[in-house]
Every structure is written in C-alpha cells, then in structure tokens.
Amino acid sequence: MKRTAKMLTAALLALALALPGTAAAADDTPAVRISEMMYKNHATLQDADGDFSDWFELENTSNRVVRLKGWSVSDGKTVWDFPADATIPRGGVRVVFASRKDKTAAGESHTSFALGEGETLYLIAPGGTIADRAACDPELPADHVLRRENGGELTESVWATPGYPNTAAGYAAFCESRKTESPLVINEAAVYNDTFALKGEY
C-alpha cells in the first residue's frame, strides 16, 4: 500500500511539473526551503557509515517548529517521505543524505534516491504542493555546493556549511567540528628531489 501511494505521488508530481503554473506551497504552509545542496560529495561530509553521500540541507525560516510529517522530497522519479517524528527547529536547519539507503538511524535521515547531474531536487509540502526546488548543475565541481546566502538564491560556493549558517562564521564552525583529537601529530616533513643517506640515530 505504501509503495503504491509513493508511485501515485511520483506520477502526480510528474504530471504537475508537466503543466504550466505548477502550484507553489499554500500561504499557511511553514516556510521551509532548500538552503544548501551537494551532489558531488567526495571529501566534505561523511555519514555515520563513513560514506561520502550526496546531501542537502533544509532551512526553517519560520518562527515555529516545523513537523515534517507529510513532507517529502523527490528527484522527479522517486518520492521519499520524511519520518513522522522528524522536525526542524524554528530558524534552524536539517541535513539529509541522498544516499539511496532509505533509513533513519544514528540521528541521520537517508533518502531512497541519490542526486545526479542534471536532476532536480523537489521539496514537497503536505498536500502535494512544491515548496521549493533546486537543479543539479552538471558543471559544478566536486565538493562545491549550491547554497543560499542572506536569504538569496542558490549560488555556487566552495564553502560548505552543512548544519551551520551559510556565512563565514558558519564555515569556520563547520571546519572546527571536523577536527579530532589524536595522540599522533606530524612534527616534520620534507620533500627531496635527490636520494640521501641517513646517518646516526633515527
């Protein structure tokens, strides 16, 4: 039954996109939008499984908590529903991995589809209206993102900030979060073009 419902939703989405004047989200729908997206994630953000999966970030621009029950995302072919208990705090963000893993575990949500070059990510509000969309630019280099800054349009950037504000301070905070404590440190490095012999203790 659930599979049939998803297939029907995908069919209706495809039909809606083929028609002129595709409906936007209703005025009373909470203001949720796609705030950042990376679909060539080679070395930026690992999921709990250690994989560098595609990912996108949703931003709640309203002054209330948004419950994502009834919300879904799609690549135009497959529709993935948010877990009934998923939320975004007011003024906050939620990172979702587009990994084809179709699971929610370890505090992470994974869609049943991945993002590909030339595809479009759709954010679908309850009732089937399209709240937002973002196209995957095939020319975007690896580990670059599309993100909004100061509430503007999605633009290319080298500064990924998943889970943090799309600002210089947010990028610094994201970089800081990736640091790990280790007893091992690099205390010397050199590059030599010629062979050499080691003498003494080493």
Language-model features, listed with the residues they occupy:
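General N-terminal leader/first-domain-start detector
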Residues: 1, 19-20
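Bacterial N-terminal signal peptides that target proteins for export
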Residues: 1-12
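Intrinsically disordered, low-complexity linkers and terminal tails enriched in Ser/Thr/Pro/Gly
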Residues: 13-17, 23-202
